[in-house]
């Protein structure tokens, strides 16, 4: 327990003494020895040595009304035997919370760049980021402004919007633009009984498919039962749109909700809505202890984005430990630094537990269930995650090019287990086992990918670190199965 307390104390002290904004450049060099460089089938697999050089920077800001982080890296990959595979890659993870008008105007912005799978039935991207025939670079961005102001008497008006962009390199599949605009009137003062009236407009436009749009007007009532730490809600209204058919349709909508927060560490949120595209629900259960975090969720919702990059799911290791460290550091910005330091100290990848996905060319109905748990001890950590999803075309009669072209539904499943142990204060070892599968009804729409990896590494002085990874991957499919063994050595320096 002393080590955990020292990690928290050191992280909090570092966060409190850090400047309002700072920039940390970095460079890294890695060498990968692989038995299957192009990952296009066991018969065609050839060994190779792949050199990756990366330059990047980390920007943090806690300057007053602007709170945010930006992590960017640019990599060049050189193949010793397959020069035609030489390429470049980018990674970006950025978020910004801006208060542009004191206590009234706010902006939430996010941006991501990363490798994503084109098909759920092909080889899924791995943590090493090596390209394959089924991966492409995807860029996503979201801007969500909000303004709140006094309307008349005790009534307030909230106007919000959201614009989301998804762009996949090398084609139009996965390229989409989503827009949402909402106006809400509600009482300024809160009490046991609450109400609101809201009008919204949302749309999705796919470059390789059709555009959809809907308008909705509804009213909501909520009732807080403080003795039970419970809040009940209900809504009813009207919706019109073309998300589920080629023609405009309309229907009445209604929904029920329940939020239960018996302790600061335990929460349950349940919602059910009957919408124009059908039934939707969102269930989320979470409980954390001083050393563990438990999550269970289920949802059925309309998805008008072309990419799954950054989508909610079982949660990455970073997401899990970010929630678990809430009692150690309540401030989100400082907690992010603490979690990153914890992951680095234990040799863990923050983006682990990534699920199976594919690029979409039309609006889909996503039905998914996720479970995850993470534990941290004095020198050990362990995490387990499971996720499954079923994707269907929101409009079954729509013709678009993606995995749903030849199958009415795409089913994916992901298991992942990671454990780590700190051998010494400057040496950590970890191991990960994962299973990913994708299934449809079309020819060749079935695959299973198993990955086993171990890692050892640690710091090289105050500003450098090293790691060695051994990986074994097995990809099973009727069309192009393959196996790969790889060893990866890397060195990173921060300035």
Indicate residue ranges for each PLM-predicted region:
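Gram-negative bacterial Sec-dependent N-terminal signal peptides
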Residues: 1-15
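Gram-negative and organellar
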Residues: 14-495
